[in-house]
Amino acid sequence: MDINLRDYCTADLDALGQLFYETVHTVNAVDYTPEQLDAWAPGSIDRTRWDRTLTEHFTRIAQIGDQIVGFGDLADDGYLDRLYVHRDFQHCGIATALCDALEEHARLQGVLVVETHASITARPFFEKRGYRVIREQQVERAGVWMTNYVMERKL
């Protein structure tokens, strides 16, 4: 399976929104309630905010052939904001390839620590990459509370 990583462009926005929704509602369903999933990924993204942050951040899109199979973005301060892989392409090395690219970019920018807020589902992936849990936290999305973890990795 040949994974191609490329830069984000605004034309990707609809595909990323759909991938985000489907991934959250399937992959994360093992760890979160339907109410939490609906609050996290309600079916439509804030297109203006997403496009702005995906453009401002270092964003990588993973493709296999013509299909977008994942994406991730990193802010200038080392905050890994989003990392999502298509539900049909889990455990294929896509998240690893995306994280490798994001972390290498951070290193080249002089960032010493990458931080993320990882879901219950994603925590083991990040732990295998050397991230450590700083704290568990309860976050509110659309009036619904859910657990995630502030995690960091020293580069």
Predicted features and spans:
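Alpha-helical structural signal in soluble globular domains
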Residues: A101, K128-R129
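Charged catalytic carboxylate motif
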Residues: A15
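Acetyl-CoA-dependent GNAT
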Residues: D7-T10, Q18-Q90, C99-A101, H105, ...
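Extreme N-terminal starter segment of soluble prokaryotic enzymes
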Residues: D2-N4
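Conserved G/P- and acidic residue-centered "switch" motifs that form tight phosphate/ATP-binding loops
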Residues: G93-A95
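Short secondary-structure boundary/hinge segments and terminal tails
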Residues: Y84, R107, P124, G143-V144
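Conserved GNAT acetyl-CoA-binding A-motif
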Residues: A106-S119
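C-terminal "cap" of GNAT-fold acetyltransferases
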Residues: H117-R123, R129, E136-L155
